[in-house]
């Protein structure tokens, strides 16, 4: 569990750094959009006043209101894009873990699960060569020492995941892919990221 806490802490720290950068870019874009829309709104307003002062005020207010609504929607979209980017970056950082860290992560994650010890480990085609027989033997020895079966093996099946693993047995899967782990933390971390990005 401490491995997951360290991972969570690292994701939050990286997210905060990425958030500052993304927020700066988003604010520049927001100012640009607002300035352009306000100028356009003012121009439309002046043209309308020429034709009819009574209608001009109503139309100008409508243009400004629509512009404000568009800006608000654009800001919401930009915020969601930035949040998604932070989580995507977290998955990429996990994918780029050094081999030893990656194998330790897999080992510690499997050993922390309540499993019987005779499951199959499904990984991505890219990760298949990272897990060798000696790693599986070590893992099985540790499972045996915990009173579990020592029959864990690498599956012949591959999955299109970005890293991590899926444990499979009798039609039941435990998804510990990097995407699933980051998604499982999303609800917990999203509010912290929003506060870091937009407060």
Swiss-Prot record:
<dbReference type="GO" id="GO:0046961">
    <property type="term" value="F:proton-transporting ATPase activity, rotational mechanism"/>
</dbReference>
<dbReference type="GO" id="GO:0033178">
    <property type="term" value="C:proton-transporting two-sector ATPase complex, catalytic domain"/>
</dbReference>
<keyword id="KW-0813">Transport</keyword>
<dbReference type="GO" id="GO:0042777">
    <property type="term" value="P:proton motive force-driven plasma membrane ATP synthesis"/>
</dbReference>
<dbReference type="InterPro" id="IPR002842">
    <property type="entry name" value="ATPase_V1_Esu"/>
</dbReference>
<protein>
    <recommendedName>
        <fullName>V-type proton ATPase subunit E</fullName>
    </recommendedName>
</protein>
<comment type="function">
    <text>Produces ATP from ADP in the presence of a proton gradient across the membrane.</text>
</comment>
<keyword id="KW-0375">Hydrogen ion transport</keyword>
<dbReference type="Pfam" id="PF01991">
    <property type="entry name" value="vATP-synt_E"/>
</dbReference>
<comment type="similarity">
    <text>Belongs to the V-ATPase E subunit family.</text>
</comment>
<dbReference type="GO" id="GO:0005524">
    <property type="term" value="F:ATP binding"/>
</dbReference>
<keyword id="KW-0066">ATP synthesis</keyword>
<dbReference type="GO" id="GO:0046933">
    <property type="term" value="F:proton-transporting ATP synthase activity, rotational mechanism"/>
</dbReference>
<keyword id="KW-0406">Ion transport</keyword>
<dbReference type="InterPro" id="IPR038495">
    <property type="entry name" value="ATPase_E_C"/>
</dbReference>
């Amino acid at each position: 569990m401490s491995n997951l806490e360290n991972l969570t802490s690292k994701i939050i720290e990286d997210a905060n750094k990425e958030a500052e950068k993304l927020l700066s870019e988003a604010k520049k874009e927001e100012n640009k959009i607002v300035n352009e829309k306000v100028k356009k709104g003012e121009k439309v307003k002046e043209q309308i006043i020429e034709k009819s002062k009574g209608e001009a005020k109503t139309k100008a207010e409508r243009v400004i209101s629509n512009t404000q609504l568009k800006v608000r929607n654009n800001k919401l979209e930009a915020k969601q894009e930035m949040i998604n980017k932070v989580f995507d970056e977290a998955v990429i950082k996990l994918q780029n873990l050094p081999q030893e860290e990656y194998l330790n992560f897999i080992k510690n994650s499997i050993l922390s699960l309540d499993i019987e010890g005779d499951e199959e480990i499904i990984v991505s085609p890219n990760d298949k060569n990272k897990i060798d027989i000696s790693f599986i033997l070590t893992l099985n020895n540790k499972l045996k020492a915990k009173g579990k079966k020592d029959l864990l093996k690498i599956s012949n099946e591959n999955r299109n995941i970005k890293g991590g693993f899926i444990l499979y047995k009798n039609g039941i899967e435990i998804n510990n892919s990097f995407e699933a782990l980051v998604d499982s933390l999303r609800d917990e971390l999203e509010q912290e990221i929003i506060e870091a990005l937009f407060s």
